[in-house]
Amino acid sequence: MENKMEYEIKEETLVVYFYGEIDGSNVSLYRNKLNVILAMNEDDVIFDFKHTTFIDSAGVGLVLGRYQQLSKEGRKLAVSRLSNTAYKVFELSGLFEIMEYLKEAQI
């Protein structure tokens, strides 16, 4: 699966879809693209990981960094459709204490 990112606006929420892997080898590319997308939009954000096959600590750092950026702007970030393994990583990292996890039906 190709590593890529797509986005759309759904009901005044920016939904960003990640495909493939998010790791140290590509996280800076994702960060740069996200900075452009987030700057063009003032909506709350959902990161959808349904098609993400792997995420490491660099990917978790990417999510945390965007959360901090959006929080400073008064915006919310939620994550959705993590694999079981990624869900455990996010949970152990304490990310669900600061951001919401959405199930598929909530998107």
Regions found by a protein language model. Give the residues of each.
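STAS-like cytosolic regulatory interaction modules
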Residues: 1-53, 67-107
